[in-house]
């Protein structure tokens, strides 16, 4: 059964092999304990917060469980329809959201669009990302994104060159 579990995650129970990686990652890495198993033997299955839908649970949508899932039972909603996994090109970078400096691997499709972000197994994050680092990468493709520096003059922002912007920043403006 393939279900849209939340805005960011998708779950397919038929692919789950009950390995427990998602349960362990959520409990020991994220310290959240959203995932657990219910039932015994052939009735065992993965559940979140005692049968709550993942979107209604205490899940923080970090995606660590998806990154560690070996079968694709948990997947990213944002990747669907963006091209086959094997055609994605990886580029390593540093997350721009806060000052921690998490290492991150971005994946681009054939059109050059960023479609996925995964934690890089190095640096301060050791392969793990917060929800902003994991799902907040698509703003770079927005037509509303600023591409030139702006300087505030007489109460309004005006386009400037990089040299002017750096000079204004150095001057304390």
Predicted feature residues:
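N-terminal export/assembly segments and adjacent metallocofactor-ligating motifs
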Residues: 1-173
């Amino acid at each position: 059964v393939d279900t849209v579990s939340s805005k960011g995650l998708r779950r397919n129970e038929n692919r789950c092999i009950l390995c427990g990686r998602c349960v362990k990652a959520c409990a020991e890495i994220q310290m959240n304990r959203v995932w657990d198993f219910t039932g015994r033997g052939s009735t065992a299955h993965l559940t979140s917060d005692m049968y709550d839908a993942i979107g209604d649970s205490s899940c923080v949508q970090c995606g660590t469980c998806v990154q560690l899932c070996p079968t694709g039972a948990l997947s990213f909603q944002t990747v669907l329809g963006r091209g086959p996994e094997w055609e994605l090109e990886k580029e390593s970078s540093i997350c721009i959201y806060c000052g921690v400096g998490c290492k991150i691997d971005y994946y681009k499709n054939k059109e050059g669009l960023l479609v996925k972000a995964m934690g890089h197994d190095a640096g301060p994050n050791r392969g793990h990302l917060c929800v902003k680092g994991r799902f907040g990468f698509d703003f770079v493709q927005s037509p509303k994104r600023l591409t030139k520096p702006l300087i505030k003059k007489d109460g309004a922002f005006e386009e400037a060159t990089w040299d002017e912007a750096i000079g204004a920043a150095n001057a304390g403006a």
